[in-house]
Structure formats: structure tokens, C-alpha cells
Amino acid sequence: MTLLMQDHKSIYNKDIEILIEVEELITSVPENKKNDFKSLIDNRIMTLLNKIQHPVAAENVFGMCIAYPNTYIRYRLIDFVEKWVPYFSAVETIINLTQDPDDLVSFKAMDVCANHKIEESVAYLSSIIDDVRESISYPKKPVGLGAQKVLSTLLDIFGVEKHEELVMLKNYFDQNGILPNNFDFEEKIPQSLIEEFEKTEEDGMILIPGGFFEFGLNENEIPDKTFNWKDAVPRQKVWLPPFFIDKYPVTNKDYDIFTEFIEENGHIFCHPNEPQNKQHRRNTYWDDRYLDNHPVTGIDFYDAFAYARYKGKELPTEFQWEKAARGEKGNVWPWGDKFDPAKVQYAGSLYNEPITSLKSWRENLLKAHADKELNHLTSDIFEQNGESPYGVCGMIGGTWEWTRSELKTKRAFHPIFENVPFNSVNSFAVLKGGSFFSHPGLMFPSFRAKDIPFCRHNEMGIRCVKNIPVYKIRESINGPITNKAIY
């Protein structure tokens, strides 16, 4: 049985056994026997840790890398963390380690930031030497080796040394939160790994082939300009590896089984940054209008993330979601280029009345929310129309679906990590598809909705994807993943 076919919980259990063995070994040789201790770490401990395959087990090692009191252990564990970059928690760990008090550790973490061009580290590194545009020609304090290492790392991330080019790129970065996009080229993943992945059988999921597709629309193609549509333009060429996506959205029944698992076993598969004592039971659990085989609603980003990891899956990026909805040809809607109310469940479906104005739409929403005579707001997943070109069902209307993409950058969403105010675009994850309360202007697949990670509106649901494991891609290409659309 290949790794890609193994049940993720059995992988997790095997990895925990490795961690227990490491914990016992790591104290078996005293630190004052320097050569023996280094040999233990370099050979036995690292060999064991490099067998770890589950992201949750890997995050235990990430925690060791940040918090273990021995400097040499933190230094060596960076090699383990690096092989998981750009997985979100590996990126966060490396950035935290750039602030480590020991140069042995912090300098090595900076090397990883430079090699992988970890753009999220720019703000943290800049806090040490201030603005790189000024520091390159007029250094401020501190002025020692550490400051020069930070400056060198930032220059490697920006990829330039000339002052004029640096100013231009830093200005772009300050405005957009990222460097110019690296989405439109093929990552050279070996065909053998792709074929192994594509041959796996994923029950209830549809394989979306890898390759190029067009993300977004041109302005003249926007089907409805009632709402803010400008971040949905223009069309952009994007390359993705293959992935599996759920044919149907996750149901209330399946989600409730997950919450029972959490209540019995604890928050094993939850987001490492989720609030303490997080309650995962959906807020629609208490409303009888939301039936078992209907799409789950009333969940936030942390709920969606935890459910996906509990299933051995992930949240889709907005690129993945949009490709699955629009197909390779980039239809405006999953079924073509014209809105078809018969294929969706939206605000007009509530009372079988077309939406003629913003006023009528708003009135319908408030009426339906208070209308206890409405038997249900959502519908059975098997009764949903509007298949995508790949055969994915119910992507438009019904429920908004969480992605793991950040609104401003389209990169991985890091909730809480950046400690930004909640009116900042950095604090929003992207949602897609519209809901039973939506106006048509909110529902075309390129439309980018947003919300903060702990918002639990009764319109928010989830659909999962399964990807080639990030560390498998890293191993196969023997270097950094440079296409930023992948993670």
C-alpha cells in the first residue's frame, strides 16, 4: 500500500509512536558528552523524525523546534521544518525562529526564508532593521552581524540588490502584501508522483486534472456589477497540480459526527492557532430547518479547517475551488456564461420570486430569517443542480464555502498569526459560491467574498480537497516550491 492510499489516522498513530521513541531517546545521552549527543541528534533522532508523514505529528516537532531549551536541537530541527515549507504551520514556525535569541538558530531560519522566498517573513525581519529601502544605503541600529544577516535575507527574498529596483518592489509589496505573483508556470513535479496520486481512489471525490486554467474574469465578462467585483478581474493564467475535491458539500450529518469525535477525543486535528476551548458544534444544530443530508452551515474557518483535517483532507485554495467550478475553459458559471436560476438555490428561491432590486433582496433575507414556516432553507445535497464541467455539484448557491486563501494576497490564510486589526484585509479568508440568501451578483465563481476566521453565519459551509502531500512534492523536486498558487 502506498503512502497516498493509507488512512490518515493510522499514519498519525504511527507518527505518534515515533515521537514517543524520540522523547525517550533524546534524554538518553547527557549534553556534556558533546560528540555523543550530537551524533544521537544527527543520526538517530533526525532519521526517526524524517519518517513522520502526518501534518499534525509534524506540528509537534515544529513546537519542539521553537520551544526546546537546547540550542543544538532547535538548530537541527529546522531541517525537518524546512521540508514541510510552504505548509502554513511550517512557514509560521520558520518565521518565529528568525526571532530566536541564538544566532545559530535564527540565522539558519533566515536562510530558509531566503531560499524559499518566504514573503510573510518580511514584516518580522523589517522590525529588526527597519525599512530595507533605507537600510541598504543608510543602516540604522543595530549594525552588527545580525543586522547584516537580516538585510541579506530581505534582499534574497526580494531578489534584487540595486536600490532603484528594491524601492520599486518594496513599494509593490507594501501595497499588495506580496511580491509579483508566481502563479503562471508549471512546477516540475515528477510524472511518477502525479500518476501515483491520480490512481488513488477517493470515495465521494472527483479528480481535477493538473494544468493551466484562467482564474478571474475580464471586466466585460462580469455578469452582475451590483457588488464590489473589482478584485475578480482580470483573467489570470494559473497552474495547479492535480487534486481531488468533494463532489458534494459536507452535510450536517457528517459534520455532527466530527463534533462528537472532538468532544470525545479532544482537538487533535484542529488548527494550532484556534481559540482555547473552541466549540465546534455548528450554530444551526439547534434549528430544525437544517436537515441531516443538507449542506452543513453555521461554521467558521476554524471549524472548516478542523473538519477537513479530521477527514485527512484540506480546505481548497480559491484557485482550486474556482477551477473545479468553472472548468478548464473558464466558464463564467459552471454550466455556461448565463445565470440560470433553475440551477441554484439562492435568495430568489426562498419564495420563488425573482430578485429585482437590492431593496427586494434585503427584504427577502430578513423575512426568510424570521419565517418559522419555511420548512428548510437549504436542500438535500443530491437534489442540487448546476454541475460543473468536472461533475462537481452544488458549488453555486446553497452555502458559501470556506477556502484557505487570504483575501488580499490569495496566498495561505494565517488567522491571528499577523496580529492585524479585524478591519484589515489580512484578517479575512475568502469564501466562494454564494448561499441560499445570496443575490446573483454574489454567486458567480470568480466573486471573492470574505470573512474573519471566527464568524459563524448560518450561510457558511465547507467542501474539502485532497492534495499531493507538500513534503512529497518538496522531496520530488529536491528544492523549494516556487509556484505560489500551490500553497
Curated annotation (Swiss-Prot):
Organism per entry: Bacillus subtilis (strain 168)
Domain of life: Bacteria
UniProt cross-references to InterPro entries, sorted A to Z: CTDL_fold, Sulfatase_Mod_Factor_Kinase, SUMF_dom, SUMF_sf
Gene3D superfamilies according to UniProt: paralog of FGE (formylglycine-generating enzyme)
One GO MF term: formylglycine-generating oxidase activity
Protein name in UniProt: Uncharacterized protein YfmG
SUPFAM superfamilies in UniProt: C-type lectin-like
PANTHER family named among the record's database cross-references: FORMYLGLYCINE-GENERATING ENZYME, SULFATASE MODIFYING FACTOR 1, 2
